[in-house]
């Protein structure tokens, strides 16, 4: 009788253990499914919010404006010239920060690509002035100036301070010079002389990557260009100060 009772007790304990395992597995499965549902829901909401932000930004960009400038806060705004008025009027911007939509909200920022220096067509003198404004020393500027021209030209002949494929193929991760225009500003990081610190910037200065564009920009928009870009254009400190103060009141 004692043996039978012991066997029954072991059987009961085994069943209880199996039940505990099954219940635990079911609970984990339910939590996983709930987490997947939440992730899917949040993903759908995030996509709709992102699309809404893009469409609202496009509404502003496609507005009937002739002048793009910065307001007192540094926000990009659009102006429209009316017949009989010498000063363009500012179009009221749509809300861009924490715009409520359903259970979520979105924010966006509009930047002017023509506020940057066109790296493929700016010319060596403007690039050199921009590097000087970023406090790059003469030796490093010579290397970057020549290496950028070598990167863009169609041959493999390097300039005095430049570099072509023979230099880049000796690096730990070898690659060839493009021998064509840059397709993205980040490509500057592949060019001899351009460091990550120079490209990314620091707390007290912006990076080179924020000041240039690979887009085919015909002219720099002085209404939105930063003082550093204005300096690269050859403006003096007094001229830059005058432009920055005047363009807020009356864009050029």
Roles of regions detected by a PLM:
Residues 2-252:
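Compositionally biased linear targeting/interaction segments
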């Amino acid at each position: 009788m004692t043996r039978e009772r012991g066997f029954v007790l072991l059987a009961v304990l085994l069943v209880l253990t199996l039940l505990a395992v099954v219940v635990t597995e079911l609970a984990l499965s339910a939590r996983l499914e709930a987490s997947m549902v939440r992730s899917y829901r949040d993903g759908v909401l995030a996509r709709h919010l992102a699309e809404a932000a893009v469409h609202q930004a496009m509404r502003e960009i496609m507005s009937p404006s002739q002048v793009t400038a910065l307001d007192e806060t540094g926000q990009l705004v659009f102006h429209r010239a009316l017949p009989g008025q010498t000063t363009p009027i500012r179009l009221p911007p749509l809300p861009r920060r924490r715009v409520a939509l359903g259970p979520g909200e979105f924010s966006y920022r509009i930047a002017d690509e023509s506020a940057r220096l066109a790296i493929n067509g700016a010319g060596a003198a403007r690039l050199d002035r921009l590097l000087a404004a970023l406090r790059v020393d003469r030796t490093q500027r010579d290397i970057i100036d020549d290496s950028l021209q070598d990167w863009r030209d169609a041959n493999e002949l390097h300039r005095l301070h430049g570099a072509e494929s023979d230099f880049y193929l000796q690096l730990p991760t070898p690659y060839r010079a493009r021998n064509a225009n840059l397709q993205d500003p980040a490509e500057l990081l592949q060019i001899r002389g351009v460091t990550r610190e120079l490209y990314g910037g620091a707390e007290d200065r912006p990076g080179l990557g924020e000041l240039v564009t690979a887009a085919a920009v015909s002219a720099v928009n002085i209404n939105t260009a930063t003082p550093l870009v204005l300096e690269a254009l050859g403006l003096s400190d007094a001229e830059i100060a005058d432009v920055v103060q005047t363009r807020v009141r009356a864009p050029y």
